[in-house]
């Protein structure tokens, strides 16, 4: 699973369950009452969410020895990335489905500001 050397999967699962209980103990505020009452409930809810987020980070870093932020993701070289949308772009969920298209010649992204 996602454990490092020395960490057991049970410790990770127990910590994740605890964090899940913390988030479930703070449901979103109701939309009833006056505008001021709704605003106060949202403000208090956001503050509790911030506290839960910091407690979760503390649990992950101190109890399991993991950073709260994910490990940096290695991106492909810039030459392979394009903004070409000549064909049907579709929705973001369908983009990239099918045969991959890699441009041989990359278009200039930043020009000097003059049009040709």
Curated annotation (Swiss-Prot):
Q: Looking at the record, which segments are called Disordered?
A: 23-48, 90-116
Q: Give its localization.
A: Host nucleus, Host nucleolus; Host cytoplasm
Q: Where is this region: Homomultimerization?
A: 18-26
**Molecular-function GO term, any one:** RNA binding
Show the ranges annotated as biased composition (Basic residues).
36-47
Motif (Nuclear localization signal and RNA-binding (RRE)) on chain: 34-50
Offer one example of a GO biological process linked to this entry.
viral process
Keywords from the named record: AIDS, Host cytoplasm, Host nucleus, Host-virus interaction, Methylation, mRNA transport, Phosphoprotein, RNA-binding, Transport
Post-translational modification, as annotated: Asymmetrically arginine dimethylated at one site by host PRMT6. Methylation impairs the RNA-binding activity and export of viral RNA from the nucleus to the cytoplasm. Phosphorylated by protein kinase CK2. Presence of, and maybe binding to the N-terminus of the regulatory beta subunit of CK2 is necessary for CK2-mediated Rev's phosphorylation.
On this chain, the residues bearing Phosphoserine are 5, 8, 92, 99
A GO term from the CC aspect: host cell cytoplasm
Say yes or no: keyword Phosphoprotein present. yes
> What Pfam families does its record include?
REV
Chief location of this protein within or outside the cell: host cell
Any further remark recorded for this protein = HIV-1 lineages are divided in three main groups, M (for Major), O (for Outlier), and N (for New, or Non-M, Non-O). The vast majority of strains found worldwide belong to the group M. Group O seems to be endemic to and largely confined to Cameroon and neighboring countries in West Central Africa, where these viruses represent a small minority of HIV-1 strains. The group N is represented by a limited number of isolates from Cameroonian persons. The group M is further subdivided in 9 clades or subtypes (A to D, F to H, J and K).
Role played: Escorts unspliced or incompletely spliced viral pre-mRNAs (late transcripts) out of the nucleus of infected cells. These pre-mRNAs carry a recognition sequence called Rev responsive element (RRE) located in the env gene, that is not present in fully spliced viral mRNAs (early transcripts). This function is essential since most viral proteins are translated from unspliced or partially spliced pre-mRNAs which cannot exit the nucleus by the pathway used by fully processed cellular mRNAs. Rev itself is translated from a fully spliced mRNA that readily exits the nucleus.
Q: Please report which protein family the annotation says this sequence is part of.
A: Belongs to the HIV-1 REV protein family.
Subunit architecture:
Homomultimer; when bound to the RRE. Multimeric assembly is essential for activity and may involve XPO1. Binds to human KPNB1, XPO1, TNPO1, RANBP5 and IPO7. Interacts with the viral Integrase. Interacts with human KHDRBS1. Interacts with human NAP1; this interaction decreases Rev multimerization and stimulates its activity. Interacts with human DEAD-box helicases DDX3 and DDX24; these interactions may serve for viral RNA export to the cytoplasm and packaging, respectively.
- Read off the domain note: The RNA-binding motif binds to the RRE, a 240 bp stem-and-loop structure present in incompletely spliced viral pre-mRNAs. This region also contains the NLS which mediates nuclear localization via KPNB1 binding and, when the N-terminal sequence is present, nucleolar targeting. These overlapping functions prevent Rev bound to RRE from undesirable return to the nucleus. When Rev binds the RRE, the NLS becomes masked while the NES remains accessible. The leucine-rich NES mediates binding to human XPO1.
Q: What is this protein called?
A: Protein Rev
